[in-house]
Amino acid sequence: MLSWRARIAGGLIAVLVVACQATVGAPTQGARETEGTAPLPPAAVIPTPDAQTDQALVALARKKIRHIVFLVKENRTFDTLFGRFPGADGVTEGFTCDGAVVPLARAEDDSPGAAHSFQSGIVAINGGRMNCFDQLDSGHNLEGYIQYHPDQIPNYWAYAQTFTLADRFFSSSYGPTAVEHYWIIASQSDRFVDNERPLESQGGEGKIGDYCDDPLERAWSFPHFTDEEEREIYRLEEVPDVKAIRATWVERWPCHDIRILPDLLEEAGISWKYYTGPSPYLTVIRGIPHVRYGPMWDKVRSWEEFVPDVEAGALPSVTWLVPPAEVSDHPGYGALCDGENWTVRQLNAIMQSPEWKHTAVVLTWDDFGGFYDHVPPPHLDIYGYGPRVPAIVISPWSKPGAIFSETADFSSVLKLIETVFDLPALTERDANANDLLTAFDFEQQPNPPLVLEERECPPTDAVFQAGP
């Protein structure tokens, strides 16, 4: 593995200064990989919590938190939703690849996004300059340079104002959705860098989303690299040279047995469920055969069961909650207002439950969606970080009205779960991740529930896609 290197907030990173000539297109045809899947990346530190975590704080967390809910929406950056938030590291204008300064235009409730693939993330970041979001597919008309005002997303802002808003929380990978959703359960993607799809040599026809159930499905992946080859990919990401990076990719069947956090929960006898919608890009757990074809599959449930379970007093100790596409906040599948209302319904159920007093929710968005953000992500390894996304820590014990500015990513939520429930790490990423515990004050007067009203959504003429 590469040594861990990070860009420090507000600092400068030395990068190769090149003209921004990167473009995003279809990957060149790579070799077909027929070997087995990658071994589990070694954890640099097995015991959790790590030595940097105050043990008294850990003890309080284990006493106060009995339930953790990882609520994952889609495709928004921090600057898109919270760039105007007082006290947070946000901006109201951005830079394009030619150096122009452009205001972040007031977004519409149904504004489209731009490309947000793995290579799109590399292009947009542009070696840390954060100025080539206009070079993405569908981004040349500055579609990604938009921003919501507080009156447009009042309930998301209410959660941020009442609880703890994280302004240095990054996507674990450059993108896209399916890849990020591996990270939220495994703290790795087993080298995958793209959404799965029908086999292109068969004409690209067929149904997506069957993963292990369809041996003809494929997804783009990095091959096994030597350390030297991995260092070269890291260098190419700094340039960036996406054409050279894509040329290394191979096709693999997205059916691969890696250990995921639910395995650790099962072994420890800790209850869990993974609530999700039908979108294939949000159900990557189907690609883990020991889950798909074993007894753990019974704990992969429809999102529609979440609120009834909470109301019945059956909230698991650990929950992944992933919405259906039309209320996921993904541009093109539904209006943001509808997605916000869905989130309110889920959180109201938790806050009206007796278990609220023992619960921590981390609400976040899975990738950047092609939208502008100005903060350079740490370049930890060849997978990311990707661009910054919002995260809100919602709990009776999260610091009220606070800005959490420590560097974190999706692996941090896994680390929080591992710390609270005394579990080992899965990979180097979560072993070294921030565990978010300093976003909490377990000796404060508990935050009361914030039960919000759903709002009437503005009319729209947009024609949305059916959820995949």
Where on the chain are the PLM-derived regions?
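N-terminal pro-sequences and low-complexity stem/linker regions of secreted or lumenal proteins
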Residues: 22-468
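Bacterial N-terminal signal peptides that target proteins for export
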Residues: 1-9
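C-terminal motif of bacterial Sec signal peptides marking the signal peptidase cleavage site
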Residues: 16-19
